[in-house]
Structure formats: C-alpha cells, structure tokens
From Swiss-Prot:
Source domain of life: Eukaryota
Family: Belongs to the small heat shock protein (HSP20) family.
GO biological process per UniProt: IRE1-mediated unfolded protein response; protein refolding; response to heat
Protein name: Heat shock protein homolog
GO cellular component: cytoplasm; nucleus
InterPro entries: A-crystallin/Hsp20_dom, Alpha-crystallin/sHSP_animal, HSP20-like_chaperone
Keywords: Stress response
One of the Pfam families matching this protein, by short name: HSP20
GO molecular function, one term: unfolded protein binding
Stretches for region Disordered: 135-172
Organismal lineage: Eukaryota, Metazoa, Ecdysozoa, Nematoda, Chromadorea
Gene: HSP20
Gene3D superfamilies (UniProt xref): 2.60.40.790
sHSP domain segment(s): 47-153
C-alpha cells in the first residue's frame, strides 16, 4: 500500500522505460499510445481527411480511357474538371473556417488523354456517394497515358507564337 495514490500513468513512467516499450509492442504501438496521452488535440481530429483526393482508379484499354476519383469531402461547386486539348485536369478546392482556425484542402490531378480518344464524347458524372467518374471512349488501339498530381495549382505563363488552346470546362 502506498502513502498517497498514484495513477497508472505515473506508475508506468517510474518503471523501467525499456520494459514499458516492450509492453506496448516496441515503438509502433508506443507512438499511438503517446499520441493519445500527450496530444489530445489530435485525438479528436478526423484523420480520414488526410487522404483527400488520393484514391483514384484509372482504366486505359482499347475501349475507353476512364478515371474514377473519391471526392466525397468536396461539394460539387468546389470541383472543376477541365479539358485543354488532350490534357484532362481535375481540381478540388475547399476552404472552411472552424472554431479552432482555418482549413484549406486542395488537390490537382492531370492526365494526357491518348491520341485515339474522342474528345467530343468525354463524359463526367458525380454520384451521391462522392465518386467522380470521367470517361472518354477510344476509337482504336490505345497509347500509354501520362499522369501527375500536384498539391497546388500552377500558374500559366504566356509564351509567344503559340496557338490558343481549346479549353473546355466539363464540370464546374
């Protein structure tokens, strides 16, 4: 029996530190345990928001070029799908003011469509579950596509002697 009550956390901190780490399965679980004990602010955070706009599926076969993105954390008016010649760009931007501060989420995904895609038949659809689908039917054998993702949008520079780009906003 102790002279004064000691809580479980203080008792663990007074024990041998290596034995305490072994109890939590080395450093992997210790990190989770420490974040729960020492950083209560992060405990209440919605960690599903960390991978916003990262889940995507791309299909490029001899029938179609298709992209499917999970954008469930964005409202329809916060999304923009744009086609510049054969360059497909999907952008999402959200700004939210909370009681603890200001949150800004943004993503940009770009793909170069294959040469045999019918650009006039490109179709976009956003369902009720937050899945954005973009399809472009192909006429013949497909070529490899190029993809890139950026965390912020790039500014366009004006270069002389370049023909104007055929820009179409497919979804906004």
């Amino acid at each position: 029996m102790a002279l004064w009550p000691v809580d479980r956390f203080e008792r663990m901190m007074m024990e041998d530190p290596m034995r305490a780490m072994d109890r939590f399965g080395r450093m992997g679980d210790m990190d989770h345990w420490m974040s729960r004990r020492m950083m209560p602010y992060w405990r209440d955070a919605d960690h599903s928001m960390l991978h916003v706009g990262n889940q995507k599926e791309v299909i490029n076969d001899d029938k179609k070029f298709a992209v499917s993105l999970d954008v469930k954390h964005f409202k329809p008016n916060e999304l923009k799908v744009q086609l510049d010649d054969r360059d497909l760009t999907v952008e999402g931007m959200q700004e939210v003011k909370t009681e603890h501060g200001y949150i800004k989420k943004q993503f940009v995904h770009r793909w170069s469509l294959p040469e045999d895609c019918d650009l006039d038949a490109v179709h976009t659809e956003l369902d009720n579950h937050g899945h954005l689908s973009i399809e472009a039917p192909e006429d013949g054998p497909s070529q490899k596509f190029q993809s890139s993702a950026h965390s912020s949008s790039a500014e366009e520079e004006e270069v002389g002697d370049i023909e104007p780009v055929n820009k179409r906003i497919l979804y906004k």
